[in-house]
Amino acid sequence: MAKIRRASFEFCQYSSRYDRFKDGIIENAFNPALGNAAVSDIGVYCIHSLVRLFGTPKNIHSMSSSLENNFECSGIVLMEYPDMIAEAIYSKVTVSYRPSVIQGENGSILIDYISHPTQIELRLREGSRDPINGGIKEILPYSPVNNNMIYEIKNFLSLVENNGIEHEYLQYSLDTIRIIDHVLASHTSVH
């Protein structure tokens, strides 16, 4: 792939509770008093994945949309790194079928669902024989499991059993929370 220049991770999932919100029934999923904004609920998957892969960004910019009750329902977070830019796109009130993408100078990696990948593709620029598909396509080896929480549970149990308070995952989580806090602090209501 050569030098990575851009990453765009997206998780836009229409909430099953949104129709009830539109009918005037405000459930916990759309109650701003509970602090469960979309960035904290589903944007975290994009942001955490970017932090795990690329580290803490040097600059963060964000924009959010709100519902009538000031619930932050969707947004975009731009994250600046020394040689690349990343974006986290998230929504609880729309749906998207676009894959998440890591773009390098010689190709791209496409990830079907950032929250629970089931297919990861490498598409290279060089040697293109099929311009419609953007070049050579290779399916990368990946074996999803039925319950994607199994990895988290195994790691969590290991941390508890080994008193792993200072584990590397802690720093990823702290960096992710700092970014989310920045987004929430800069959130202005856009209806």
Annotate each PLM feature.
Residues 1-58, 190:
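Predominantly a Rossmann-like dinucleotide-binding segment in NAD(P)-dependent oxidoreductases
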Residues 20-25, 75-76, 117, 124:
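Short, glycine/charged-enriched secondary-structure capping and boundary segments
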Residues 29-34, 133-141:
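Short glycine/proline- and acidic residue-enriched helix-loop micro-motifs
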Residues 42-45, 151, 172-175:
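A generic structural signal for residues located within well-ordered alpha-helices
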Residues 44-118, 153-164:
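Contiguous beta-strand/loop segments that form the cofactor/metal-binding neighborhood of enzyme cores
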Residues 100, 117-131:
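Short polybasic amphipathic segments
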Residues 140-154:
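Active-site loop of classical SDR/Rossmann-like NAD(P)-dependent oxidoreductases
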Residues 154-191:
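C-terminal helix-rich "cap/oligomerization" subdomain common to oxidoreductases
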